[in-house]
Amino acid sequence: MSEATQYDATHARWKRDPEAYWAEAARGIDWDRAPQRIFDAAMGVYGRWFPDAALNTCHNAVDRHVAAGRGQQDAIIYDSPMTGQVQRITYAELQHRVAKLAGALAARGITKGDRVVIYMPMVPEAAIAMLATARLGAVHSVVFGGFAAAELASRIADAKPKAIISASCGLEPGRVVHYKPLLDEAIALSPHKPSSVLILQRPQAPCELTPGRDEDLLVAEAAAAPHACVSVAATDPLYILYTSGTTGQPKGILRDNGGHAVALHHSMELVYGVKPGDVYWAASDVGWVVGHSYIVYAPLLGGCTTVLFEGKPVGTPDPGTFWRVCADHGVKILFTAPTAIRAIKKEDPEGVFLKKYDLSKLEALYLAGERCDPDTILWSERLLQKPVVDHWWQTETGWTITGNFRGLGLFPTRAGSGGKPAPGYDVVVLDE
């Protein structure tokens, strides 16, 4: 079977019997109650996936890997040029920390369905907070760290969180962004007030805590009893992610637990061709959909090691940073935005910095977030001598709409093309 035929046959198989296709994909997830029905077209506006099933997303992303004997594998590699720190967190360590933070949230009254706003920089505690919220069956809403107070206030007002998890500061090249004054102002502006605020005190700029409301995150986590995973319906919400709309009220994307877990787990092998134990790096931010899907959930659902990077493509300290991270940690797939590659290309057009590093373990570069100009793809292919895949999707979908699929064998494509539709999508051009 030729490589192109494997894509064609797989897409045709999905189109012929979508429910059978997704029933098979659903076998990659641990269910508390396995789905008997795959899709109910009559539920909701667009139909609902796995309407009779139950699971916990945190269990699937963390606990099951420990139970399967992968506890000593790295789950998260935190690499921060901003602090000069590299921290490796195994699946067993991640399970311990997530269970403890879930216990701290539960002790503060957070239960299934409650909302938790997370306003954090790119630190492991951001991912731990997301997973701890999911562990309780609660709903997280991550707001990009450093967003202005008015933007944060509108999201607090809309989501009505019982708790907020934040940090004292974020770090940008040449400056410290103090989060606490922004958070205090946002809470003052919002008609809804959280009952609990947990703050990660970063040594670069600790902040004063508001008595009676604020607590030290790490102190609260350390003092808590670990909490087990709470089973939720597949159709129950996992998170709200507000789109960066410029008009009117913020628009919240509400993601369910079941369909999300199945699609993201499936995408790791289908789209990116990675398997458990592989190192995967989405150079994005947890505040955006790429961060939700491909820094936190998909790599962990797939039993991979995910890189959580606090830095920039250039200036932290140089345009070789991305290649240094790939070499140091044995990254197999790098996923970033064309803007990042263009910034590197501008500062290092001949790849002088790139040539300093051993990129033998890197197998492909994936790009998304905006259309990629052909020059950037051709430049990347020439210097890396690896496949470069431009793929397209949206906050609303959470994973690939069109792309090229390493798990099926890459088909030939032209620079500037967004590829072909993923199984699950029937893409039609309606107008020239």
What are these regions (language model features)?
Residues 116, 137, 246, 303, ...:
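Conserved G/P- and acidic residue-centered "switch" motifs that form tight phosphate/ATP-binding loops
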Residues 1-89, 93-96, 100-103, 182, ...:
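N-lobe entry segment of adenylate-forming
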Residues 58-59, 76-131, 148-153, 216-218, ...:
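Conserved AMP-binding/adenylate-forming core of the ANL superfamily
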Residues 120-134, 146-150, 284-302, 395, ...:
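Conserved coil-to-alpha-helix start sites within the AMP-binding
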